């Protein structure tokens, strides 16, 4: 939602998340080689990654999402064409939201970073798309801390071995269509215009985001909401 005035003819434009673009194998350089690697994390879990390289690269871009395993990442061809290798990996619990713990996913990412450093890559850059963005930021925060200052337990109380783990620090971060984290994302999905949880059709018009009077415009126009409406809605 925006609080600024709507410009004439303004059209909504979004960037592509993991599900907003298509994989095009024909766009890969013809000399690319793809290897599949299974790694062990510091706490003994197994994770899988895909390394795409043409040979001789000193830099590698690393894509990881906490929930999705996406070896067919739509940005791989562009990264390879620019002269860097491309690494994409999953967590220990791909595609299973109920078992995902971001704290242990940091150990999964660390296994990938250690593997790439051992291969001799001089520079590693994390690329976080959608939910991969806050995961990359979380990893950078924990890797920059002294071991004794790292998180010791998940929110549910499960011990996590970040203090004794090697968390190789990346040299950079790229955020693509990133959100602020799973908690803020889910919280923003709550609809305050629903007056009664037992009756989802009972709506408070003053908070209804799809009423033209509140700023809604049908596509392809962009909806624009006043700062007052956004404040009350949030």
Place the predicted regions along the sequence by residue:
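N-terminal cap/lid segment of alpha/beta-hydrolase-fold proteins
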Residues: 3-59
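Active-site glycine-rich loops that stabilize anionic/oxyanionic intermediates
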Residues: 55-58, 63-70
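Conserved alpha/beta-hydrolase
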Residues: 76-100
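Catalytic nucleophile-loop/oxyanion-hole region of alpha/beta-hydrolase
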Residues: 92-125
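Gly/Ala-rich beta-loop-alpha elbow adjacent to hydrolase catalytic centers
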Residues: 127-137
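Conserved hydrolase catalytic core segment
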Residues: 138-171
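Alpha/beta-hydrolase-fold enzymes
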Residues: 159-234
């Amino acid at each position: 939602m925006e609080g600024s005035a709507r410009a004439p003819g303004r059209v909504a434009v979004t960037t592509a998340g993991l599900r907003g673009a298509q994989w095009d194998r024909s766009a890969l350089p013809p000399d690319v080689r793809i290897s599949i690697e299974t790694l062990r994390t510091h706490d003994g879990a197994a994770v899988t990654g895909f390394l795409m390289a043409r040979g001789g690269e000193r830099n590698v871009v690393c894509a990881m999402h906490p929930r999705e395993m996406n070896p067919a990442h739509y940005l791989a061809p562009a990264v390879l064409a620019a002269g860097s290798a491309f690494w994409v990996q999953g967590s220990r619990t791909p595609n299973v939201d109920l078992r995902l713990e971001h704290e242990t996913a940091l150990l999964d990412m660390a296994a990938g970073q250690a593997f790439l450093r051992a291969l001799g890559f001089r520079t590693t850059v994390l690329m976080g798309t959608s939910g991969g963005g806050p995961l990359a930021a979380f990893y950078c925060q924990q890797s920059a801390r002294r071991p004794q200052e790292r998180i010791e337990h998940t929110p549910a109380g499960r011990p996590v071995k970040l203090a004794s783990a090697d968390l190789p620090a990346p040299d950079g971060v790229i955020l693509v269509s990133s959100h602020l984290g799973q908690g803020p994302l889910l919280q923003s999905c709550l609809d305050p215009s629903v007056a009664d949880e037992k009756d989802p059709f009972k709506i408070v018009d003053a908070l209804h985001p799809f009423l033209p009077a509140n700023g809604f415009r049908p596509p392809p126009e962009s909806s624009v909401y006043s700062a007052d409406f956004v404040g009350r809605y949030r």
